[in-house]
Amino acid sequence: MTSKNSSKDPVGVLGAGSFGTVIANMLAEKTDVILYARTPERAKNINDKRESSGQALHERITVTNDLELVAKSCNVIFPVVPSANLRELIRRMSPYLRPYHILIHGTKGFDVSLPDNKQLNANRPLSRDYVKTMSEVIMEESSVVRVGCLAGPNLAGEMAAKQPAASVVASHFDEVINAGQQLLKNERFLIYGNSDLIGVELCGVLKNIIAIGAGVIHGLGLGENAKALLISRGMVEMIYIGQALGGNTKAFIGLAGVGDLIATCSSQHSRNFTVGTRLAKGEKISEIIESMEETAEGVRTIEIVKSLSEFYKVRCPITEALHNIINEEMTVGDATTYLMKFPFRAEIDFL
C-alpha cells in the first residue's frame, strides 16, 4: 500500500493538551504541523497567543478546528486526546479518513461500549468484548488500517523542556513504525519499534493504576521501600491482567512497560501520581477530578480493570484496594493494611 502524500506534506496532531502540544512542537522541527483543537474558540486563542498548555508554539504549527482540513492535508496523524473522547472524535473524522492514512495515537486509556446504554459498574464482570484499545477504536470507526501507538516514559513537562527521553512506536506495520521514527527521532528523543501493538497499548493503560498507588504511598510518607514494593508488585499485576487481555509479557519489561511505570510512579508532575497523593491527604476523588485541568486516565482505568478482573478471575489486589479507596469503601490506612496482609505466594510465576 503506497502513501498518497509526499514527505513535504504536513503532519496532523489531534489534541492541543500538554502532550499533544509537545508532540506537535517536536514534529515541527522537521515538518509543517496542523494542530487540531476541540473548539473554534480554543483554536483561535492558541493561534493568536502562539501558546498552548503553557508551551510556546513552533512557527511551523498551524492550529485549526477543522477535521476535514487535517485529514485532507496530512497523511500521518497523531491523535492525542483522552480515551473517553477518541471514539467520538474519530467517528466525526471518519468521512475524511482513507486507507492511505497512518494514525499513531498517544492515548493511554480504554474505551468501554456497553449494550443498552448500561453504565460501567466495577462490581459487575466485564469481558474484553466491551473493552477496546485506542487502535481498535480507530479501526472500528474508520477505514484506516495502518495504526500505531506511541508509548513510553514521556512526561510532557520534561519533553517540553527538551530533556532527553525515549519512546516506543508499536504497530503491526513496519511502515507505521518507520514513519514514527523518521518524524519524531532526534538527538534528544529515541524511538524504538515494537510489533506487539496490543501489549504496548496495555502497558500504557495499566501503569496509570499503579501510578495512583505510588502517589498514595508518597502522600502517606511511607518511604522508598514501600514505593519499590508497590511498583514491583504493580508490575506483576499489570502482567497478569495484560496476559488475560491478550498482551505479551515481553512488552511489559520494555520501555513502554517498566520504563513508563518507573517514570510515572516517581514524578510529582504525573497526573495519576498526583491523584494518589491527594487521595492519601484525604481529598475526595470528585474534588480532585474537578480541580484538574487535564484527564488522569488511571481513575477510570481502575474501574474498568476491576470489572475485567472479575470476569477473567485475575486477582488484582492493588487495583481492588484503589477501587475501594476511590469509592470510599475503605480508608487509605485500611487499604495499606489489606495489601500488606494479602497472601502473595511465589514472587514471579508469570514467566
Spans of features found by a protein language model:
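NAD(P)-dependent Rossmann-like dehydrogenase/reductase catalytic/cofactor-binding core
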Residues: 2, 214-218, 243-253, 257-351
